[in-house]
């Protein structure tokens, strides 16, 4: 069950993990930010799991690499 989900919280996780000071582009993916590498993506997903009390399986961990894909996946877990 998805706990306390909001899109703004999800964006905050991305901004915190990627150390983005300004506006975050919701159409972004792993190739759009220099510091959004596989380790950062892993940390983003771990932070999302912790914040919203959900779990990603191993297939999701390797496939989710854009904000929109992650947003859709998180919403499906509700």
Please state what every model-predicted region is.
Residues 2-36, 40-46, 51-78:
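Phosphopantetheine-dependent thiolation modules in NRPS/PKS and related acyl-activating systems
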């Amino acid at each position: 069950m998805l706990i306390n989900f909001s899109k703004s919280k999800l964006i905050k996780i991305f901004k915190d993990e990627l150390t983005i000071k300004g506006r975050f582009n919701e159409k972004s993916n792993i190739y759009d930010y220099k510091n959004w590498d596989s380790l950062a993506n892993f940390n983003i997903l771990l932070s999302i799991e912790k914040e919203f009390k959900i779990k990603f399986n191993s297939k999701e961990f390797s496939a989710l690499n854009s904000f929109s894909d992650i947003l859709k996946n998180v919403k499906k877990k509700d």
